[in-house]
Amino acid sequence: MASPTSTNPAHDHFETFVQAQLCQDVLSSFQGLCRALGVESGGGLPQYHKIKAQLNYWSAKSLWAKLDKRASQPAYQQGQACTNTKCLVVGAGPCGLRAAVELALLGARVVLVEKRTKFSRHNVLHLWPFTIHDLRALGAKKFYGRFCTGTLDHISIRQLQLLLLKVALLLGVEIHWGFTFTGLQPPPKKGSGWRARIQPSPPAQLASYEFDVLISAGGGKFVPEGFTIREMRGKLAIGITANFVNGRTVEETQVPEISGVARIYNQKFFQSLLKATGIDLENIVYYKDDTHYFVMTAKKQCLLRLGVLRQDLPETDQLLGKANVVPEALQQFARAAADFATQGKLGKLEFAQDARGRPDVAAFDFTSMMRSESSARIQEKHGARLLLGLVGDCLVEPFWPLGTGVARGFLAAFDAAWMVKRWAEGTGPLELLAERESLYQLLSQTSPENMHRNVAQYGLDPATRYPNLNLRAVTPNQVQDLYDIMDKEHARKKSDETDARKTTTGSAGTEELLHWCQEQTAGFPGVSVTDFSSSWADGRALCALVHRLQPGLLEPSELQGMSALEATAWALRVAEYELGIIPVLSAQAVVAGSDPLGLIAYLSHFHSAFKNTPHSSGLVSQPHGTPSAILFLGKLQRSLQRTRTKVEEETPCTEEPPVSEPSVPPALPSEHEEAGAEDVCELCGKRLYILERFCVDGHFFHRGCFCCRTCEATLRPGGYGQYPGDGYFYCLQHLPQEDQKEADNNGSPENQELPTPGDSTTQSGPSSPVPPVTEASPVPSPSQPARRLIRLSSVERLRLSSLNIIPDSGVEPPPKPPRSCLDLAQESLKSSFMGWGVLRAPQVPEAIEKGEEEEEEEEEEEEEEEELPPPLALEVEQSLLTLAKNSGDMTKYPTWRRTLMRRAKEEEMKRFCKAQAIQRRLNEIEAAMRELETEGMKLEVALRKESSSPEKQKKLWLEQLLQLIQKKNSLVTEEAELMITVQELDLEEKQRQLDHEFRGINREETLKTQADRLSEDRVLRKLLDVVNQRDALIQFQEERRLREMPV
């Protein structure tokens, strides 16, 4: 067997090339290798075959085997699929290089231009399972021996670029460094082709290069002309990245990485951080690679308070500009946060140096993310067609905590290469673009959970990666505007079609709503709906609507003797409590007919939720989407407040009692009171427009005003509480607690029981969200007068009447205390090993070659990754992790121990990514709602103004306002669903922490003190409460899933 240090100098060049850790070293060693072998670089696949033929010793052969295995996939057709295709790739980032590799494997000629001359970015990227397998298949372990050797799967951008650069060079990609692509140069005449405009003046070979495919991977700030970019904006979010020198000492290697800590479910960590350092964060991540890499999201007020930002400026670019950021304070901020997160175990933190020799710490803005409206275009001039495709950040900017940049970037690179293959096969332009856009629709929805589980089968063909693939989701007619024949003009036609489509879409909005209301209320005596004002004044139409949608709640016979105001107020309450329809106007306004716009907005909620429900159905219907989720969250919120009030009443107090909240709804206003209470925010006293109205228990606020008293965070259903001592609202993190006794009596938010779905027997009336000014009186009951004496609201009475009284003899006995989770873990572990036979360490020959040993270890890791066992339950997973860390027996099974540790970290990362995605989307929804509110305010002012505007114009404004209301309804739908998931994540984290705490105090009964028993009992009660809450949540989700299944 040949030795790399033998007489063949090419072996030395190859080993230097493989081990090179700087961009310039890679290029120089590869040029030396090509000279030694007499091969011209940049020659495509023929160059690769020449190099492989002359380097046949063991170290090189292991790499060739991997690359050949990839190239043998059917989609590449042995490198003959695109032999006549010429491609230009812009950008040598990870996605650009990955696209270049795929195009080279297809046999295309690939030229890549990059404006930089070296790789210097230390930031660490999280990797999805398929990206790990993909990079291993390209020889990642050969080029970078520490690739994914820790408990977290990640790699620095610089190392990723280096290994992909080496593969691209071996496959014959021609790379030009230090040149910037500035635009396209169309063919001047028939018979010529497309060229690139490049700065500075390129060599003749590059300047004259004509290509028919352009793949742009130039980053988010560069998108070729013709593509439309859409901004996805959220609340202000300031990210901070910091890279510290990794000395690779024993102490540093033992510091655990942090897959992600998010405030959305782990508030104690951030409270401790704030108390110890004064730093207020939303999240923090710590990875170890070439550097110690930290990334975190900081709050603006904290940065201002600690002097990191000099002053508060309205524009984000100015706020985070060099002139407004204090470098020394920023470094101190990042160092303190990193030191606290790692408990000071990294010792003295020294910043790594960036490309300019400065400390590698930066503050950046990810308030908004850019996304291209389309992923590809085709331009044609003088008969020459050019296919343009986007990959990487210029296609979709990633959200850093989720690890989506590399994963979706690689997927986009595969999809773009597949598009080029189809282009080379002669697929028609519109058909090709339709297929590409169908794939693009899937990209933003992809996650490790909804892709094919077997990552070993992933290839260029999209069917190997995406389950339930539909390449005809987008039709050719929908992508005609992406095919640009530059000799013709389509812009005006497209604009006219768009305007006509908008007008047609909105023209039937109010008419459709009115017709639907007429259908739902038809047949009820005394009800005739003809408009959005007087037809609803007596309350009968609204009661009829509620009765039709959910029979049994509002019987028409019960309306006898009720005033219009009482009937309307009753219907509003029942719709809120039983259907989840939040009011946007008061009962007075409905009766007076003074706010038809508000009534339209309110009725549109019914229409959105029940428009697909047959109005002739006699079954009790349940709303889909918003109302079902809001109904559940509303019950949770009332349960939270009711339990706190109960604890306060049971707690003896020697001081002056705080203002108590009534257990019945606020008093109904008299018919003589002035209507329009919903027009003014009860917190700021300013005017409320329809789209701004946020209702809590009959009181109206601006969404921006309804925030935490302490941190000013937006409050959402299920995530806040009202403190009776001052009447203010707080997020659960800052909700004032009474004392430990109250906490033990389940008074804290974490002990609140989630309402059981469909349970209408445990709900009391809501409490007033503001300190009451006058004593509350009960809602008049529509039943017998004697009922009024017990001061029950109508909703409470209805729930009480639906109770099924059964004897207690059939009630199950109290649950037994659970067995130790550690015992369950040990049993699970034993059963996992059953049937394996005797486990022995593999017999390794003493004279094995080092390269063969490394190859065998790498194959073991790949097999372990490809054949993952099915996921375990959360509790068992955590217990197995504890056992893996603490049990001496696990040393006998290092593979299992490594697998358990990795899977536990993966579960942490999944929760973190899910929480961050939710937080990001909630911020985007909030920003979108503010924009809708601004637009709606302008339209509402125009509609309410006494002006001489023609009726046609007013009707158009009304339709536009209804469209905005419907958009807001959709956003509220999504927000409610996300808040359900927030509850799920929070309960999972609480159960994990309580389970860990319970294991820590669980010991032999003879060794327990009285304090131990009390602590164990307290933790056990909390744990059982959380389990019950999770059970209620799962039951709710299952019931909703069954409702949504097609009959």
Swiss-Prot record:
The record marks 816 as: Important for interaction with ARHGAP26 AND ARHGAP10. Its EC number is 1.14.13.225, 1.6.3.1. SUPFAM superfamilies: Calponin-homology domain, CH-domain (SSF47576), FAD/NAD(P)-binding domain (SSF51905), Glucocorticoid receptor-like (DNA-binding domain) (SSF57716). FAD binds at residues 95, 114-116, 121-123, 181, 293, 393. Residues 912-996 form a coiled coil. Residues 679-741 form the LIM zinc-binding domain. Residues 851-868 have a biased composition (Acidic residues). Residues 507-611 form the Calponin-homology (CH) domain. Residues 905-1047 form the bMERB domain. It catalyses: L-methionyl-[F-actin] + NADPH + O2 + H(+) = L-methionyl-(R)-S-oxide-[F-actin] + NADP(+) + H2O; NADPH + O2 + H(+) = H2O2 + NADP(+). One of its GO terms (cellular component) is ciliary basal body. Residues 644-672, 739-787, 849-872 are annotated as: Disordered. It is found in: Cytoplasm; Cytoplasm, Cytoskeleton; Endosome membrane; Midbody. GO terms for molecular function: actin binding; F-actin monooxygenase activity; FAD binding; metal ion binding; monooxygenase activity; NAD(P)H oxidase H2O2-forming activity; NADPH oxidase H202-forming activity; oxidoreductase activity, acting on paired donors, with incorporation or reduction of molecular oxygen, NAD(P)H as one donor, and incorporation of one atom of oxygen. The modification Phosphothreonine is found at residue 475. Monooxygenase that promotes depolymerization of F-actin by mediating oxidation of specific methionine residues on actin to form methionine-sulfoxide, resulting in actin filament disassembly and preventing repolymerization. In the absence of actin, it also functions as a NADPH oxidase producing H(2)O(2). Acts as a cytoskeletal regulator that connects NEDD9 to intermediate filaments. Also acts as a negative regulator of apoptosis via its interaction with STK38 and STK38L; acts by antagonizing STK38 and STK38L activation by MST1/STK4. Belongs to the Mical family. This is [F-actin]-monooxygenase MICAL1. It comes from Rattus norvegicus. The lineage of its organism: Eukaryota, Metazoa, Chordata, Craniata, Vertebrata. The gene is Mical1.
